[in-house]
């Protein structure tokens, strides 16, 4: 397994080992002792999966506020996405900055996003299956979100959309800006 630090400390790209032969392949998607050695020491308590039928589907940017904040370990098991994490911790030296990575069924890559980040992804193919491991349970009252095209963060979805309108949920179409959002995260240092 290879771990790559991104420009934002704590946000990691993980390239899993894939062992293939004429039958197909095997890859270990999670091993607590191995991930702890990489610095991922959260206790995952829930696994989720989403399916997006149409290319150009954009889900995000979302989070859960404390005390139900979630770290996420995400991967794409069918199709291809661009996945993005935005630092929304007030006072952070990287506040408002974002990083992205391509995740696909071919590259078997994972993206670790700690608590205090907004998360979203854009499907680059039809029929995308996306998986999440999270370290806290879902809590509707703790939901947070901001516009995918927030001008403060300026995540570069546009060049990936190639002029087509993204497929958005109603909630994501009318989401607030980061400044207007109910974001409750505060940077507490390293």
What are these model-derived regions, one by one?
Residues 1-106, 125-127, 134-190:
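Non-catalytic, conserved peripheral segments adjacent to functional cores
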Residues 111, 119-124:
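Short beta-strand His + acidic residue motifs that chelate non-heme Fe in jelly-roll/DSBH
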